[in-house]
Swiss-Prot record:
Main location (coarse class): cytoplasm
Annotated protein name in UniProt: Translation initiation factor IF-2
Protein species of origin: Pectobacterium atrosepticum (strain SCRI 1043 / ATCC BAA-672) (Erwinia carotovora subsp. atroseptica)
UniProt biased composition (Basic and acidic residues): 85-98, 108-164, 177-237, 278-291
Location of the region described as G3 in the Swiss-Prot/TrEMBL record: 454-457
Keywords of the record: Cytoplasm, GTP-binding, Initiation factor, Nucleotide-binding, Protein biosynthesis
Gene Ontology terms for molecular function: GTP binding; GTPase activity; guanosine tetraphosphate binding; translation initiation factor activity
Start and end residues of each stretch annotated as Disordered: 48-310
Positions annotated to bind GTP: 408-415, 454-458, 508-511
Family: Belongs to the TRAFAC class translation factor GTPase superfamily. Classic translation factor GTPase family. IF-2 subfamily.
Comp. bias intervals (Basic residues): 263-277
Gene that encodes the chain: infB
Chain segments carrying region G5: 544-546
Length: 900
């Protein structure tokens, strides 16, 4: 056949030329596209490709699993289901064809050698049998010959006696008999020699065949041993039935087994006869003895149903996983022991417990280790810790901008000061001119960037100020020079000290005529804020937010303090921060203001924040501009959370949204458990107090606010208004507008609806009108708290006071058929009015309290009698009036109560 080129061959088999050249190279032939290819090379390439593509696994392992359920009795009379899985593994080995052929040839040679040796042995046995038969025949012939010779001798004796008479006959017969005996002896000798020659030939042939079989077996012994080493040992019960030695060995083994069985039988009988030792025997031993000795006539019933489990001779040490709390029964189940053993161990350790008692993790660890087990402690928040620790963080820490919180008393000019720094009008936008949110802003100055947090100064915003102090690096304490130190100023100092944050004092309103900065220094020194010129650590800067005086000095003081602190943060990696403020926007959903502490917060990150989680859908700065990332010390608004997070929660970027949801749900469940436990505890503690006290009025409130911090502050302030008689109960609170659900809740709980910087939608207004609910809107927290106080005051029980208006002395007593005893009196003090309450005093002791029924002056009924005049007084339902008694006239006055 004509040789073809590689290129034409590639076109013929429809494969790329480069691939065909590579295949030739793999087969050991170096070709190019223009080289020719012979038929032999084609066959070589085809064999190479078939060998490559035909490679199948030489070993195949199959695993079979069978699952079943087993009910195991547990403590408390219950049973638990145990899943049982039985696994079977089987391996199939595919041999190489050449190796398989060689093994087959060796196996064939071995079988032929065995068959030849078997045939030789059978022929040897047959020849031995023939030899024995020939020997027996020869022996029988010799015996017959001896018998014949004896008979002939007897005949000769008889013939000698008749010798005289038969001389002629004897001389003729004797030569004939000797000739016959000679011929028979020669024939027997020839036959014996022929048999001996045949026997020698058979033995020689048997020895030759046995020698040849032994030589072949020695030649194949090495190959058989190698093959037996590679092949799995399938059976050891192989023997040659025709081998004499094998039969003897097998008979000896059978005799040994039979002897051991008889020995066990005798021992079992002796054990059964010893009744005194039955207490020390186990149930399994008695069952075995009965199984061996039953069946009197040698017929033993099969013992397939007898359990073959043996009691462990040593304790099993387990890995016991213990949670934060565990009951004694659960601990016993984990260690696979009885609960009584655990209780005994605890008693030895000095702790008394019942089987259902809950023990802590440390006690359970001591008990388990005392019983010899290995303890693995498991924390319930293990998932939370794993999620928090699985983070990508950079290693290079860089300088970051300081976070500065401006704190101080209300109306001391905090926001105005920040407003001047930002050159905007923030204070005018706040309702009432007071700050009610935490404002987070970052400001670029000539000397660097500074992030400012503006906190409220009103007393209701304590928690918001505390959060501001915890998230900050430096506190700027604003004190008005004309007002001095006020309550919220002292509270701000306490927050700063608790957070261990340095304080820079800004003495504001320095341009006012009545400003007294030295008085401010003196008052602050009483609370541990000492100026540097007095040997302290705090910088004092005189500023004016209106005129702009001292603003640059204040910024320089802040940056100087930040330089001393050496503030650093890792800029790269997954971010974490703190929630400054959060609220619910009707169009955007939950919105959280987050101050980034370290790392970079990017759009699209998965954030875990307290009880909430979510992917960041959008990010905005404090001016409302869309941004995609934020570094350390930058405040941003993020959208995309599952709910409104609580202000002050830590915001952390995590990898997996599924794990973030699990951690958030775990935190919610934990919070719910703690809340229920706290409520249960308060119920138990207040049980007897609630039984003794009277009816308590409750003012139910549904509160809605624009941001989370304001809602929290108002809730705390309202609950502090509660008294022993009127309690404020906030049945619902939240962030966002007032919805139909809020109105329905208020109608069901007979509550008033308070909206702080929010409004009700159309559906909520319809419910409010239909149910005649009390809906009020507020924008200043002062007004809200004052009106709630008024509502609580109206719910207070009225207070009554008795006021003495007159005093009369009894001079004489007259009898009247209509009124009975009538006292003639002189009014000594005040005025006596008709139908008023009176008290009768004798020796300054009240002996009667009743009502003045009749009042007369002379014979005329009058309504009142004034001081220094005489009158007649008839006391209703009382006749024991004596001269000298004093009649005290009083009236009850209702006093209107208010909430302080």
């Amino acid at each position: 056949m004509t040789d073809v080129t590689v290129k034409s061959l590639a076109a013929e088999i429809q494969t790329p030329v480069d691939r065909l050249v590579q295949q030739f190279a793999d087969a050991g032939m170096t070709k190019s596209a223009s080289d020719s290819v012979t038929q032999h090379e084609k066959e070589t390439l085809l064999a190479h490709l078939n060998r490559d593509r035909g490679n199948a696994p030489s070993k195949l392992t199959l695993q079979r699993k069978t699952r079943s359920t087993l009910n195991v009795p547990s403590t408390g009379g219950k049973s638990k289901s145990v899943q049982i899985e039985v696994r079977k593994t089987r391996t199939y080995v595919k041999r190489d064809p050449i190796e398989a052929q060689q093994a087959e040839e060796e196996e064939q040679a071995r079988r032929e050698a065995e068959e030849q040796a078997q045939r030789a042995a059978e022929e040897q046995v047959k020849r031995e049998a023939d030899l024995r038969e020939t020997a027996e025949k020869a022996k029988r012939a010799a015996d017959e010959q001896a018998k014949r010779e004896a008979a002939e001798k007897a005949k000769r004796d008889v013939a000698e006696k008749e010798k005289v008479t038969n001389q002629q006959n004897e001389n003729m017969t004797k030569p004939a008999q000797s000739e016959k005996a000679k011929r028979e002896a020669e024939a027997a000798e020839l036959k014996r020699k022929a048999e001996e020659t045949a026997r020698l030939k058979v033995e020689e042939e048997a020895r030759r065949i046995a020698e040849e079989a032994r030589r072949m077996a020695e030649e194949n012994a090495g190959r058989w041993e190698a093959e037996s080493a590679t092949k799995p040992e399938e059976s050891a019960d192989y023997h040659v039935t025709t081998s004499h030695h094998a039969r003897e060995a097998e008979d000896e083994n059978d005799r040994q087994v039979e002897g051991e069985r008889r020995t066990r039988t005798r021992a079992a009988k002796v054990t059964k006869q010893k009744k005194g030792n039955r207490q020390s025997e186990s149930k399994a031993d008695r069952e075995e003895a009965r199984a061996v000795t039953r069946g009197g006539k040698g017929k033993r019933k099969p013992s397939s149903l007898q359990q073959s489990f043996n009691k462990p001779v040593q304790a099993v040490n387990r890995d016991v996983v213990i949670g934060e709390t565990v009951t004694v029964a659960e601990l016993a189940n984990k260690m696979a022991v009885k609960g009584s053993q655990v209780i005994k161990t605890m008693m030895r350790l000095g702790a008394m417990a019942t089987i259902n008692q809950v023990i802590d993790q440390e006690t359970a660890q001591l008990v388990a280790e005392e019983m010899g087990h290995k303890v693995i402690l498991r924390r319930e928040n293990e998932l939370e810790e794993a999620v928090m620790s699985d983070r990508d963080m950079g290693v290079a820490a860089e300088f970051r901008a300081p976070v500065v919180t401006i704190m101080g008393h209300v109306d001391h000019g905090k926001t105005s000061l920040l407003d001047y720094i930002r050159s905007t009008k923030v204070a005018a936008g706040e309702a009432g001119g007071i700050t009610q949110h935490i404002g987070a802003y970052h400001v670029e100055t000539d000397n660097g960037m500074i992030t400012f947090l503006d906190t409220p100064g009103h007393a209701a915003f304590t928690a918001m100020r505390a959060r501001g102090a915890q998230a900050t690096d430096i506190v700027v304490l604003v004190v008005a020079a004309d007002d001095g130190v006020m309550p919220q100023t002292i509270e701000a100092i306490q927050h700063a000290k608790a957070a261990q944050v340095p304080v820079v004092v800004a003495v504001n309103k320095i341009d006012k005529p009545d400003a007294d900065p030295d008085r401010v220094k003196t008052e602050l020194s009483q609370y541990g804020i000492m100026p540097e010129e007095w040997g302290g650590e705090s910088q004092f800067v005189h500023v004016s937010a209106k005129a702009g005086t001292g603003i640059d000095e204040l910024l320089n003081a802040i940056l100087l303090q930040a330089e001393v602190l050496e503030l650093k943060a890792v800029r790269s990696g997954m971010a974490n921060g703190v929630v400054i403020e959060s609220f619910l926007d009707k169009g955007r959903g939950p919105v959280a203001t987050v101050l980034v502490r370290e790392g970079t917060l990017n759009k699209g990150d998965i954030v875990l924040c307290g009880f909430e989680y979510g992917r960041i859908r959008a990010m905005r700065d404090e001016l409302g501009r869309e941004i995609t990332s934020a570094g350390p010390s930058i405040p941003v608004e993020i959208l995309g959370m599952s709910g409104v997070p609580a202000a002050g929660d830590e915001a952390t970027v995590v990898r997996d949204e599924k794990k973030a949801r699990e951690v958030a749900l775990y935190r919610q469940g934990k919070f719910r458990e703690v809340k229920l436990a706290r409520q249960q505890k308060s119920k138990l503690e207040n049980m007897f107090a609630n039984m003794t006290e009277g009816e308590v009025s409750e003012l139910n409130i549904v509160l809605k606010s624009d941001v989370q911090g304001s809602c929290e502050a108002i809730s705390d302030s309202l609950q502090k208004l509660s008294t022993d008689e009127v309690k404020v109960k906030i049945v619902g609170s939240g962030v966002g507008g007032i919805t139909e659900t809020d109105a329905t809740l208020a109608a069901a709980s007979n509550a008033i609806i308070l909206g702080f910087n929010v409004r009700a939608d159309a559906s909520a207004r319809r419910v409010v009108e239909a149910e005649s609910l009390d809906l009020r809107y507020y924008s200043v927290i002062y007004d809200l708290i004052d009106e709630v106080k008024q509502a609580m005051s109206g719910m207070l029980a009225p207070e009554y006071k008795q006021e003495i208006i007159g005093l009369a002395e009894v001079r004489d007593v007259f009898k009247s058929p209509k009124f009975g005893a009538v006292a003639g009196c002189m009014v000594t003090e005040g005025i006596v009015k008709r139908h008023n309450k009176i008290r009768v005093l004798r020796d300054n002791v009240v002996i009667y309290e009743g009502e003045l029924e009749s009042l007369r002056r002379f014979k005329d009924d009058v309504n009142e009698v004034r001081n220094g005049m005489e009158c007649g007084i008839g006391v209703k339902n009382y006749n024991d009036v004596r001269p000298g008694d004093m009649i005290e006239v009083f009236e009850t006055i209702e006093i209107k109560r208010t909430i302080a």
